[in-house]
């Protein structure tokens, strides 16, 4: 128990190295010590085991049921008036002529009856299915690897540049890596700039951002908008300047507003659950299906979960919104005058201001 070397009896060592035999008196000393230290060991050692020829359900739980079919007793024991076991008691082992059952002192209270009862089955218990030697095992379908080692991978200096195990677990959200949405750093910078310009705290900014989202649902988020935006405080209209909202938006204001796409979609759906509501973006495009109202705002961000019908409707509305728009890379230059130096020299004998003398030929009017 403490990790020490195994104990070897002195008699065994003497017999091993000296070749001397072992006397019965020496063995008796060990036997007496066993009887003193481990009394239960000797009682279990002296137990007699009887085997019955009945059927036993080894999988059933409990030990209070019948052990199985009782084989008929033969010999003197059967003629001596042996009684069958009572219902619920352990089955008695078969006896033959000349054999005696162990008494209580010899068995120490755990004799053959207890041993047989411990392996008995509960009456009415469910039997385990026997194993048939002719049955076959379950055939499993082989599973292919998600990424095979045989596929051609990009290599640099003879080594793969991709980590296949990482790719199997790398499943980012499409919106988080999309280049049509402002990064989190850009959004944080835009938020802090508006918070500083409006001189508001975080709790007040949540109300202002909610009002700005609803205003953009109705009026769009074109980078060309200017002036002010409004939100309602009950029946009172509150006006906020648009300049800090547009100027601090990077890369564009629409890419900033893409962060509000899911919230705006849920807001429109909520409004439609209480009243008939279509955003102004959908009214301008004459969208008649109110089930598509949740997609009728210009900063809606399409993803893999967007239905095909909703994608088509949103694309048609976007095409109608941008039709006829002409974005010029360069405007009219303010310096419209032409500065060109005239190096021509004219004399009085020239035909005209733009024509020199042609060998005395005079121009008549």
Swiss-Prot record:
It comes from the Viruses. Signal peptide: none annotated. Belongs to the potyviridae genome polyprotein family. The record marks 52-53 as: Cleavage. This is Genome polyprotein. Its EC number is 2.7.7.48. It comes from Sugarcane mosaic virus (strain SC). The keyword Nucleotidyltransferase applies. Residues 56-136, 334-365 are annotated as: Disordered. It is an enzyme of class 2 (transferase). Residues 68-98 have a biased composition (Low complexity). One of its GO terms (cellular component) is viral capsid. Keywords: Capsid protein, Nucleotidyltransferase, RNA-directed RNA polymerase, Transferase, Virion. Residues 105-123 have a biased composition (Gly residues). It catalyses: RNA(n) + a ribonucleoside 5'-triphosphate = RNA(n+1) + diphosphate. Pfam families: Poty_coat (PF00767). One of its GO terms (molecular function) is RNA-directed RNA polymerase activity.
């Amino acid at each position: 128990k403490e990790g020490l070397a195994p104990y070897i009896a002195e008699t065994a060592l003497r017999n091993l190295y000296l070749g001397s035999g072992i006397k019965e008196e020496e063995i008796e000393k060990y036997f007496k010590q066993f009887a003193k230290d481990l009394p239960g060991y000797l009682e279990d050692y002296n137990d007699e085991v009887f085997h019955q020829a009945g059927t036993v359900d080894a999988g059933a739980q409990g030990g209070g049921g019948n052990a199985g079919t009782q084989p008929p007793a033969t010999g003197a024991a059967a003629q001596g008036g042996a009684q069958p076991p009572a219902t619920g008691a352990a089955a008695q082992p078969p006896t033959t002529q000349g054999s005696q059952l162990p008494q209580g002192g010899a068995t120490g209270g755990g004799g053959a009856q207890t041993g047989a009862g411990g392996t008995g089955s509960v009456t009415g218990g469910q039997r385990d299915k026997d194993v048939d030697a002719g049955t076959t095992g379950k055939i499993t379908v082989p599973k292919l690897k998600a990424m095979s080692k045989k596929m051609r991978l990009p290599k640099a200096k003879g080594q793969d540049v991709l980590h296949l195990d990482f790719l199997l677990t790398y499943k980012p959200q499409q919106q988080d890596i999309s280049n049509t949405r402002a990064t989190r750093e850009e959004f944080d910078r835009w938020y802090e700039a508006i918070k500083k310009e409006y001189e508001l705290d975080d709790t007040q900014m949540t109300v202002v951002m909610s009002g700005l989202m609803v205003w953009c649902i109705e009026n769009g988020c074109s980078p060309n908008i200017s002036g002010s935006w409004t939100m309602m405080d009950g029946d009172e209209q509150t006006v906020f300047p648009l300049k800090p909202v547009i100027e601090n938006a990077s890369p564009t204001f629409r890419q900033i507003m893409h962060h509000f796409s899911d919230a705006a979609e849920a807001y429109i759906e909520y409004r439609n659950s209480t009243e008939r509501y279509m955003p102004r973006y959908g009214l301008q495009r004459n969208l008649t299906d109110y089930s598509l109202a949740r997609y009728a705002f210009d900063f809606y961000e399409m993803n893999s979960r967007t239905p095909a019908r909703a994608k088509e409707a949103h694309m048609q509305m976007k095409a109608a919104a941008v039709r006829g728009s002409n974005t010029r890379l360069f405007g009219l230059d303010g310096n419209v005058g032409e500065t060109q130096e005239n190096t021509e020299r004219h004399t009085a004998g020239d035909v005209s201001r733009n024509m020199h003398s042609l060998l005395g030929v005079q121009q008549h009017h």
